[in-house]
């Protein structure tokens, strides 16, 4: 066994427990997490976001390899199209949709390892185990482990940035500092929403460990250096990426248009997913406050750190309450929950040890189980619920496939990304269009049309060979163009029903039929 390099003077290394006492329990947690998410992976076809990102990744790879045209994803994606979409397209090429989803599972498993390691360095093995269990018990954690989107990758990178910030304060040196800052920048580039937790990671570098303090320059220096590394990396990336990426960041994140969901609805949804966890974290913060008031000194940074980690769990709900939208909230809350699980691990571990000293170890374990058990039960049900929110598209894609052929024909399909993903080998991306932001120049007058008038004019000219309506996200547009389809001679070739909400009506233009 190699000897460990000494850390900075006066900063003790955390004790390393025996393998069986530390890693085998974590392995059991990871196996349970893998089983819960893998069950979801097999239960449904591609979600629209999955189809979008994987399909975009194939286009980006073709553009990088052969210079083929590619859509301007950087202007409307909420993360760089050259990071996750490219990575997930490779996974999809190797293992199909399940391979892409297993990549997300690997990322989420690594996030669990990161919360275990970070908590172990701060509070010991028992707290680390409890933190990992709490994180795995969450429905959003299980959901992201089976969903091929930006979120799992960005969360995992953010988690390891947080771990290296902890490591920096507990015996790590400049490599930990650089790793924390660079990973923080990479997480933000992977999914822009991850930037919300930049202050949290910097705060960990200030407050964590035996030399954490709000009064010492050394502590502030650590946080500032992490931020400096982050800023340099992000600045260099922004300069290299160009104006389109900056505009895309502003459009999707910084200046995102507000939604129409009420404060109470967004708050209630967030409470449903992570509310119980945050209540336990709040209890941990209050315990730390009492402890700090009694002991003073070094106990105060521990309280401020616990408070920071609790606030991290509130950041996503507060931000989305601010912009009146619950869209993607079930994914975003898991980013902050990762940090809050460190406090939850601490309070559960102290509960176990307190009851062990006064009653019996069994009492302590039972108390922890009474907290984690309901979390896991509810979380498992929530994971299944989230995974069932979209319709199974297998029958729809099979019904549409005979009418789709690579060439110049154009297809107007509501939420087209899923069929475009499954039928990518027999179409070009330019052939697909959804019912949002349709623009058309009138060939007779040269006038630019947009929205419903543009769609109706295109239908009257039979420019769309296939039109698919499902009366969900663009229901008003669907109803407005339905009479135009009938008047222009389009015929309904099939209606496919899928699940509770999926009902796809497939129209084809006059004279257009199945491919030979």
List where the protein language model places each region.
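Membrane-proximal lumenal/periplasmic loop motifs of glycosylation machinery
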Residues: 38-48, 64-85, 94-97, 269
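Start-transfer (signal-anchor) and selected internal transmembrane alpha helices
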Residues: 1-38, 222-226, 306
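Transmembrane-lumen/periplasm boundary regions of multi-pass, lipid-linked membrane glycan transferases
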Residues: 186, 198-296, 301, 316-327, ...
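Membrane-interface transmembrane helices that cradle and orient dolichyl/undecaprenyl
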Residues: 122, 126, 161-177, 187, ...
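Short periplasmic/luminal acceptor-recognition loop of GT-C membrane glycosyltransferases, typified by
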Residues: 384-394, 398-441, 464-476
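Transmembrane alpha-helical segments
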Residues: 194, 318, 322, 347-352, ...
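Short acidic/glycine- and proline-prone juxtamembrane loop motifs at membrane-interface regions
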Residues: 47, 104, 140-154
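Signature aromatic-anchored transmembrane alpha helix within multi-pass, membrane-resident enzymes
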Residues: 26, 226-231, 292-293, 297-305, ...
